[in-house]
Amino acid sequence: MYIFEDRGSVKRYYSQERIAAITEAQGSDYRRYRELWDAPNIMDDVLEKPLEIMLELTSWCNYKCKMCDKAFVPEKDKVNIPVESVRRLVTNINEMKVASLWVGAFSECLIHPQIGDVLDVLKEADVLDFTIITNGSALNEKTAKKIIDAGVKRLSVSLDAATKETYYDVRKGDLDQVENHIDRFIALRGEDMFPSLRVSMVMMEDNVNEREAFLEKWKGKADIIDFQVLMDASHIEHLADVTEYTPECVEPFRRLAIRYDGVVLPCCTSYGTYFPLGNIRDTSLKEMWEGEKIRKLREEIKTKNFNKVCRNCKKVTQ
């Protein structure tokens, strides 16, 4: 049985039986972490450490999705994070006892040329929750086995279409290939609880008519089926005529995002690139989490005195 949950910009359907079993299997520490993540007063007192670290392994993507700027990365700008930087990050994560690691923040993570070595290092992260998000195109058998062996708790595959024609139109990829990869992953996982499987569709004019077909296709296979609202960042240089703001953005209060080049950001949206906090090559996560830059940003959010970049983000505008 699938339950519907309205999460604002995300409309979610989830397998009640599977998610209940998964949550129970993850234990009481995990449940306490999730309660803290969803706490309505999370902005009142700054946590001593981020709840989650998001990590980008590459600067680029092998797909050409029409709604994503990663489709247009020049060859000279295609960069992959060094394995040693990942190792340094894992050391930081373990020292701070961060609860959650999310890999694949802004680009396609599984095309990293040393993805096997990266997963071996990430396996050493002592976290309660470990998520990988991918387009699924590079989810071959070897990588799928590595993901399962690394202790990943959640695998999230961005699909955006129910038919191969729409999939190619939106993503310029091969849906049959990706679905075969997912089916093999499910078979390799077998009766194990983890990783759970989430599939998602970013709703836009091109695919909205396939919502029901997408839902029916993935019921019985995916544990979570999400429909997301497309966030438009094209107007970032033009201040919106907005007079009311609500401090709904809790990103800098609960997570940090790390780019392929080691630069650390206070949020996982494209707007976050305007607020670099430092670099994991020479600064610890603890220093950046407690630093002046992020403290100033948090205060702006709490007092609704938003800077011109955040002022255009849907998380804080009405």
Residues of each region from the PLM?
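Short aromatic-enriched loop/helix-cap "lid" or pocket-rim segments at secondary-structure transitions
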Residues: 67, 115, 143-144, 169, ...
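Conserved C-terminal portion of the radical SAM core fold
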Residues: 96-104, 124-131, 148-159, 176-241, ...
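C-terminal accessory region of radical SAM enzymes
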Residues: 2-13, 181, 187-196, 218-247, ...
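Short, small/polar residue-rich loop motifs at catalytic or cofactor-binding pockets
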Residues: 250-252
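Conserved alpha-helical substructure of the radical SAM core
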Residues: 2-154, 165, 170-176, 180
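Secreted/processed peptides and extracellular or luminal domains of membrane proteins
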Residues: 67, 71-74, 224, 255, ...
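Short catalytic/ligand-binding loop motif for oxyanion handling, primarily in non-cytosolic enzymes
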Residues: 75-77, 110-112, 140, 163-167, ...
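The −1 position to Zn-ligating cysteines in a subset of zinc-ribbon hairpins
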Residues: 60, 64, 248, 309
